């Protein structure tokens, strides 16, 4: 029998000092988790029960999709990461260490290399493909500033899966299957989510979708079409080409115009009495690479902003930082007057919406001068890239309707890795013609421990957690208001046995505490329902409380089981 007096759930009156998000505050106060170090958490019985439910849902859906579960070592030899080329690229988040024999290892934040090593030289023929292996295990990422509880910690539980294919078409089929599988996982958990276009980040690859649970405290900005199913992370969002109804500036030919001290887009637009849409803005960044750094110039409309992740991917840099005035001078660039005409010895890219635009105004690479009447034509096609940040109110690239901005928390990510890792690690198979080919790979991750926190970020109130029936550690709590009332206690014990025999997860609060304390804990822990057995039992009445909205209802004892079967079971 699951009695509160025997159940370990130490609740706290005060939240941790560094806790700012509801999930961090309530999960710690309610005794679901306990922080033992920076970004490190223990899961107590309540938290472990929820964690197991999440794991079971993930496992059931992955198995249903034909994936096979394995369990890889938490520690990976550094040689595998060196072979793939990620050892130095990944940065300080990758925890590197040596054993007593000076052998180098890493704590795996992801397991592409380890999983590829598992199948390399064992899957040798197209006849053995496709293959999808997954695991649910610990990961470690040495975050510089762990925060937000389970949402950004250093050690976390994750489901990561990897698929191997003979061709790109079959990889595409598996990608779509995982899209449906992840959608089903999150639907079963009762979460409001969107699958969004995304940047592949350090993992790499081409096709990429993130699964975002909508929450007002979300750390990611996402854009959602008001009409169709298009949704994208702001780092990867696209839009229908923007137009402007304002009059375009006219010049009979391209010419240089004196613009004294006109260094900003706003002052340039005012000077020529035009919309900034018809100007070209230069954004100069210093691109950091493994062994060097250099300046790169990105040209976009004056009315747009540079999307830095897009820009970083465009020039394949490890990082982009602002260029200093000294660096601009050294490169011969005049701040406020930079243009691509005549620009030499510096890499530059132009936003693809500017291609074939005419009668534009931009810097002349000379102090106090701009070029007018510029046509963006006859340039190398490779210079045109998607560089701008899409914003709320822009039009959907799929249907043309307006985009709205929302907040989301990433809980899953699926990638088409292609042949990036298999080529780097020389992992091949023989195709139908007997020719050696690198595997096509897919990668599919979902944050299991993160989902526990996300469920509360999406569903809580000022009093505490609000669990749905699928994820709740207990679906129903039976609260005896007065333990000295033997009749009430006897009724509660019998009710507990009857409900558990029906398969319901029930917690009996038999603590010798004030009724107010018990109710506060119920509201904090957030089980979907509570039954209060008190003085009303004399009139054959019991109070049923629904945690969401704290809706209360008096029920006759002879109708209780029937109502519980309808509402709770």
Swiss-Prot record:
This is Proline--tRNA ligase. NCBIfam families: PRK09194.1, proS_fam_II. It catalyses: tRNA(Pro) + L-proline + ATP = L-prolyl-tRNA(Pro) + AMP + diphosphate. GO terms for biological process: prolyl-tRNA aminoacylation. Consists of three domains: the N-terminal catalytic domain, the editing domain and the C-terminal anticodon-binding domain. Keywords: Aminoacyl-tRNA synthetase, ATP-binding, Cytoplasm, Ligase, Nucleotide-binding, Protein biosynthesis. One of its GO terms (cellular component) is cytosol. Its main location: cytoplasm.
């Amino acid at each position: 029998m699951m009695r509160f007096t025997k159940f370990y759930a130490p609740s706290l009156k005060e939240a941790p000092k560094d806790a700012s998000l509801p999930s961090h505050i309530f999960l710690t106060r309610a005794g679901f988790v306990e922080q033992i170090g920076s970004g490190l958490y223990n899961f107590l019985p309540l938290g472990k029960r929820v964690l197991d439910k999440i794991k079971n849902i993930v496992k059931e859906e992955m198995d249903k999709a034909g994936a096979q579960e394995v369990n890889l070592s938490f520690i990976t030899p550094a040689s595998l990461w060196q072979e793939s080329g990620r050892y130095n690229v990944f940065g300080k988040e990758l925890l590197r260490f040596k054993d007593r024999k000076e052998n180098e290892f890493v704590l795996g934040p992801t397991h592409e290399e380890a999983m590829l090593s598992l199948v390399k030289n064992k899957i040798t023929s197209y006849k053995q493909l496709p293959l999808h292996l997954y695991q649910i295990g610990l990961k470690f990422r040495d975050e510089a500033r762990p925060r937000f509880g389970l949402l950004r910690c250093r050690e976390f539980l994750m489901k990561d899966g990897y698929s191997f294919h003979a061709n790109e078409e079959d990889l595409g089929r598996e990608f779509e299957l995982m899209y449906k599988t992840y959608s089903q996982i999150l639907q079963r958990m009762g979460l409001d989510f969107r699958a969004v276009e995304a940047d592949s980040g350090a993992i790499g690859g081409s096709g990429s979708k993130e699964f975002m649970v909508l929450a007002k405290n979300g750390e990611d900005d996402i854009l959602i079409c008001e009409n169709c199913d298009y949704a994208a992370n702001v780092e990867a969002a696209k839009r229908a080409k923007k137009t402007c109804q304002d009059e375009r500036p006219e010049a009979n030919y391209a010419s240089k115009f004196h613009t004294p001290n006109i260094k900003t887009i706003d002052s340039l637009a005012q000077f020529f009495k035009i919309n900034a849409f018809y100007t070209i803005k230069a954004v100069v960044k210093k691109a950091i690479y493994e062994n060097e750094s250099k300046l790169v110039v990105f040209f976009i409309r004056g009315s747009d902003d540079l999307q830095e992740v897009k820009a970083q991917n465009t020039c394949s840099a490890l990082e982009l930082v602002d260029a200093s005035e000294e660096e601009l001078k050294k490169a011969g660039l005049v701040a406020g007057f930079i243009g691509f005409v005549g620009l030499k010895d510096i890499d530059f890219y132009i936003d693809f919406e500017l291609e074939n635009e005419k009668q534009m105004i931009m810097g002349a690479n000379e102090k106090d001068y701009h070029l007018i009447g510029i046509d963006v034509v006859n340039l190398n096609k490779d210079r045109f890239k998607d560089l701008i940040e899409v914003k709320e109110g822009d039009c959907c690239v799929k249907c043309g309707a307006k985009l709205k901005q929302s907040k989301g928390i990433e809980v899953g990510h699926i990638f088409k890795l292609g042949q990036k890792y298999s080529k780097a690690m020389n992992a091949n198979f023989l195709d139908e013609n007997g020719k050696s080919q690198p595997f096509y790979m897919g990668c599919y991750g979902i944050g299991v421990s993160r989902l526990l926190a996300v469920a509360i970020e999406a569903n809580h109130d000022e009093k505490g957690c609000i669990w749905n029936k699928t994820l709740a550690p207990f679906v129903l709590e039976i609260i005896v208001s007065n333990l000295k009332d033997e009749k009430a206690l006897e009724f509660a014990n019998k009710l507990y046995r009857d409900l558990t025999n029906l398969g319901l997860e029930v917690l009996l609060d038999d603590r010798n505490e004030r009724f107010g304390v018990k109710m506060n804990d119920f509201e904090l822990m957030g089980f979907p329902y509570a039954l209060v057995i008190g003085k009303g039992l004399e009139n054959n009445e019991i109070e049923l409380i629904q945690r969401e909205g704290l809706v209360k209802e008096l029920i006759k004892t002879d109708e209780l089981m029937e109502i519980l079967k309808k509402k709770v079971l």
